[in-house]
């Protein structure tokens, strides 16, 4: 007895196991995943309808890849287990009840994507099953045409049968682009294929015959055409003959051929060319073959016609040369313009130009086809590039949020290369190797600042680039101000010790040494050997003979240093102070270059220069005058500059007086002379009462002769300057304006999104726009109050007078006096 095996066991392929692992309810979910990966229709969809959705694998994929708060509806004959954010209906898609249920769920919305993965119960016969599936697809298309928005997508499953081509033709009537594809998840032995219809046209009227299976799948008998039907019965239109042309045989002379403006047209009309002129007939270019070709032009091919055109060009050049010689003999100047014009005509009428035109037309057609293909490829590449950039941005965000630790990602960052001792340069790296794989992750967490959200140090500037890119301009301004304040506080706390450059170089050399690589010789022996090899060259042969000169130079340098110290001591006695720098010179390479041994060399060089020029320029200037002095303790002392005198602010009369002094020497001299008068030595203002001096100012002071117009101009300038806001007020106004503009842009984007939404009614659009404007603060308008002056005898209640709209307030003279008295009381309180 044979062993019976289960059929379902053989169908459990890799997609079946993947569905089990990932939590999808069916392996067909990977079909939709692969279709979406190719066409990208789920990412932009806001509403989706899945027909024949059980058990819900496609609904799971749709809810995962569609935007948040999207509407997803699934319909099937059998119940579907609940899925988060998905509406499921148990209806038959071929009934009217299903349409009513969908209208109730969608209300005024239109869906962007309609999916159909339905198939009938198979098993009777292949012909019957294929027809049932095509009929089911036609019903799904009917629902899609009712609920799809313009430009929507329709993805359906179709069996390959004789009803496949009629279905494709119907799809092409409703959609701009129809493509048939078979995803990898679909089994090879299955007859199913998926048709992706893109760009729903949304016609105003649809003929019901499109959705009638009897009409749509009706077999059309193609009658065999007879031979008489294949032959065209239409006669060609008679073009006729030229006016006055009574013969069909045209004979022309050679001169007519040479004078013809268009030689190609001339050859198409001519039957024979007669060679009447003996000189042209006996020309060297006139061969026997050309003579025979001229006798019957209608039988010539392209090669012979081209030879005739080249022959014509040579004869025309010969005639042009002959005419020039005759003109010289008769002292007639032949215009070069006619010759150039003739050459242009020859170039235009050459057979090469006619052949090039045909080639150009073919090339243009090929170029157009290539351009279309390139445009499609570029669009596809842009789409893929955009997707890759989006994934990279998400990965950066995960790393910044510390969601991914280094070493966890699969990408090869160079850590998987072969181990080498050369790569370990410091003891810290050695400790990390000893700790294991997670040492780099711990080091990264230790390096991250935990106390402050914003890192001010220069070493972490690169880490803060991504943070700064996500902040608003206002927040960036606040961060920069905070950074400057922190740097100022750090400078005021104390002075950092300056390390000499030589010590820094020694430390760098010690850090660069590899702790795991041991040299064969000691360091001192190796340095001495390298030094002896370097100074053993011929260029340093006479350097020992100059030892006496080096001694003299050293003594002169010491003398110059003593003179400089005495100069600095004198300046200290005069009261010049030294100032400690706010910032460490180690942060600036230029200042660091002046410290340590390099400073001594620079001072020695400058002292020698000062000695050489001391006779001409006087005593040498101290080195620390501009750059500051570097003392042996390592601190840089900078002298304090003289305080800048505060400029005197002149009033309008003072500015007018200054303009008179600057423009005229005579007026300046007169003003100086007039300044000596009996009011020059008045008593000081502090000795007399204030009220007395204020009263006597206008009588005990001589008026300066100034132009009133000039004084008024300067007063107007002062008014304009005083009208300007201070810097803080201007910055505050600018920030407020920038916030308002930003809020306006956000509001405009939201309003445009609401207006462009097709799925809501106009009433809902207006309500949403009002809410947006109200939230932005644009709907609040300041009420205008109308003031009415009350007459005597008016009671407390006043009726609205005619012609006054809106809010009004009744005022009288008593109220005006009360307000004035209240203001006076407030001023007295302020004075106290």
Swiss-Prot record:
RNA 2'-O-methyltransferase involved in the processing of the 34S pre-rRNA to 18S rRNA and in 40S ribosomal subunit formation. Signal peptide: none annotated. It catalyses: a ribonucleotide in rRNA + S-adenosyl-L-methionine = a 2'-O-methylribonucleotide in rRNA + S-adenosyl-L-homocysteine + H(+). It comes from the Eukaryota. Keywords: Coiled coil, Methyltransferase, Nucleus, Ribosome biogenesis, rRNA processing, S-adenosyl-L-methionine, Transferase. Residues 503-514, 600-618 have a biased composition (Acidic residues). The gene is FTSJ3. The active site is at residue 157. One of its GO terms (molecular function) is rRNA (guanine) methyltransferase activity. This is pre-rRNA 2'-O-ribose RNA methyltransferase FTSJ3. Residues 332-358, 485-523, 546-631, 795-832 are annotated as: Disordered. PANTHER family: PRE-RRNA 2'-O-RIBOSE RNA METHYLTRANSFERASE FTSJ3 (PTHR10920:SF13), RIBOSOMAL RNA METHYLTRANSFERASE (PTHR10920). Gene3D superfamilies: Vaccinia Virus protein VP39. Residues 726-758 form a coiled coil. HAMAP family: RNA_methyltr_E, RNA_methyltr_E_SPB1. Residues 345-358, 485-495, 811-821 have a biased composition (Basic and acidic residues). Its EC number is 2.1.1.-. Interacts with NIP7. S-adenosyl-L-methionine binds at residues 56, 58, 76, 92, 117. GO terms for biological process: maturation of 5.8S rRNA from tricistronic rRNA transcript (SSU-rRNA, 5.8S rRNA, LSU-rRNA); maturation of LSU-rRNA from tricistronic rRNA transcript (SSU-rRNA, 5.8S rRNA, LSU-rRNA); RNA methylation; rRNA methylation. The keyword GTP-binding does not apply. One of its GO terms (cellular component) is nucleolus. It is found in: Nucleus, Nucleolus.
């Amino acid at each position: 007895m044979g062993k019976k095996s289960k059929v379902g066991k053989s169908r459990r392929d890799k997609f079946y196991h993947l569905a089990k692992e990932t939590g999808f309810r069916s392996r067909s979910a990977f079909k939709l995943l692969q279709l979406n990966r190719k066409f990208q229709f789920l990412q932009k969809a806001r509403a989706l309808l899945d027909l024949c959705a059980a058990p819900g694998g496609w609904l799971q994929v749709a809810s995962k890849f569609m935007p948040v708060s999207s509407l997803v509806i699934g319909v099937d004959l059998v119940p579907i287990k609940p899925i988060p954010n998905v509406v499921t209906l148990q209806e038959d898609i071929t009934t009217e009840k299903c349409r009513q249920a969908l209208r109730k769920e969608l209300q005024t919305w239109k869906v962007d994507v309609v999916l159909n993965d339905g198939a009938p119960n198979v098993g009777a016969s292949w012909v019957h099953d294929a027809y049932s599936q095509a009929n089911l697809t036609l019903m799904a298309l009917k629902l899609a045409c009712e609920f799809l928005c313009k430009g929507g997508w329709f993805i359906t499953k179709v069996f390959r049968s004789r009803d496949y081509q009629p279905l494709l033709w119907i799809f092409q009537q409703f959609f701009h682009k129809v493509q048939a594809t078979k995803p990898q998840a679909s089994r090879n032995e299955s007859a199913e294929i998926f048709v992706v219809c893109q760009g729903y046209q949304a016609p105003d009227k649809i003929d019901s015959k499109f959705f009638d299976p009897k009409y749509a799948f009706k077999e059309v008998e193609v009658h065999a055409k007879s031979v008489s039907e294949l032959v065209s019965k239409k006669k060609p239109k008679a073009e006729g003959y030229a006016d006055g042309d009574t013969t069909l045989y045209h004979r022309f002379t050679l001169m007519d051929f040479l004078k013809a403006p268009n030689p190609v047209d001339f050859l198409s009309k001519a039957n024979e060319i007669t060679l009447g002129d003996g000189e042209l007939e006996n020309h060297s270019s006139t061969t026997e073959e050309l003579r025979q070709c001229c006798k019957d032009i209608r039988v010539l091919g392209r090669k012979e016609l081209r030879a005739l055109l080249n022959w014509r060009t040579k004869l025309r050049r010969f005639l042009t040369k002959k005419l020039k010689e005759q003109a010289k003999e008769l002292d007639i100047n032949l215009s070069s313009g006619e010759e150039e014009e003739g050459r242009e005509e020859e170039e235009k009428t050459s057979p090469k130009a006619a052949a090039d035109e045909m080639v150009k037309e073919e090339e243009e057609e090929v170029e157009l086809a290539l351009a279309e293909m390139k445009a499609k490829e570029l669009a596809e590449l842009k789409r893929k590039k955009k997707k890759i950039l989006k994934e990279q941005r998400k990965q950066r965000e995960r790393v910044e949020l510390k969601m991914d630790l280094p070493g966890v990602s699969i990408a090869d960052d160079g850590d998987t290369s072969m181990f080498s001792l050369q790569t370990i340069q410091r003891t810290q790296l050695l400790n990390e190797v000893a700790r294991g794989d997670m040492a780099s992750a711990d080091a990264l967490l230790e390096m991250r600042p935990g106390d402050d959200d914003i890192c001010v140090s220069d070493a972490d500037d690169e880490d803060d680039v991504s943070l700064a890119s996500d902040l608003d301009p206002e927040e960036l301004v606040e961060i920069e101000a905070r950074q400057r304040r922190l740097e100022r506080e750090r400078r005021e706390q104390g002075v950092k010790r300056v390390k000499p450059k030589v010590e820094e170089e020694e430390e760098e050399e010690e850090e660069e040494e590899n702790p795991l690589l041991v040299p064969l010789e000691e360091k001192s022996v190796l340095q001495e050997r390298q030094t002896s090899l370097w100074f053993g060259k011929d260029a340093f042969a006479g350097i020992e003979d100059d030892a006496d000169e080096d001694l003299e130079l050293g003594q002169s340098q010491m003398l110059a240093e003593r003179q400089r110290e005495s100069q600095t001591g004198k300046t200290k006695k005069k009261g010049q102070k030294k100032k400690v720098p706010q910032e460490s010179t180690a942060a600036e390479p230029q200042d660091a270059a002046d410290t340590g041994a390099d400073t001594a060399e620079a001072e020695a060089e400058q002292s020698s220069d000062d000695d050489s020029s001391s006779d001409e320029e006087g005593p040498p200037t101290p080195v620390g005058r501009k750059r500051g002095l570097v003392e042996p303790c390592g601190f840089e002392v900078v002298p304090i500059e003289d305080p800048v005198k505060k400029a005197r602010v002149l009033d309008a009369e003072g500015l007018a007086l200054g303009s008179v002094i600057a423009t005229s020497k005579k007026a300046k001299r007169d003003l100086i002379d007039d300044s000596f008068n009996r009011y020059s030595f008045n008593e000081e203002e502090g000795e007399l009462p204030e009220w007395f001096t204020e009263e006597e100012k206008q009588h005990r002071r001589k008026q300066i002769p100034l132009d009133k117009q000039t004084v008024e101009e300067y007063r107007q300038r002062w008014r304009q300057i005083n009208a300007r806001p201070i810097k803080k007020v201007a910055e505050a106004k600018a920030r407020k304006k920038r916030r308002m503009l930003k809020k306006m842009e956000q509001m405009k984007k939201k309003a445009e999104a609401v207006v462009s939404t097709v799925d809501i009614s106009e009433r809902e659009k207006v309500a949403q726009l009002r809410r947006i404007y109200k939230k932005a603060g644009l709907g609040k308008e300041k009420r205008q109050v109308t003031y009415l002056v009350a007459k005597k005898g008016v009671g407390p209640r006043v009726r609205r007078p005619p012609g006054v709209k809106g809010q009004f307030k009744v005022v009288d003279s008593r109220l005006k006096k009360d307000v004035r008295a209240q203001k006076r009381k407030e001023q007295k309180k302020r004075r106290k």
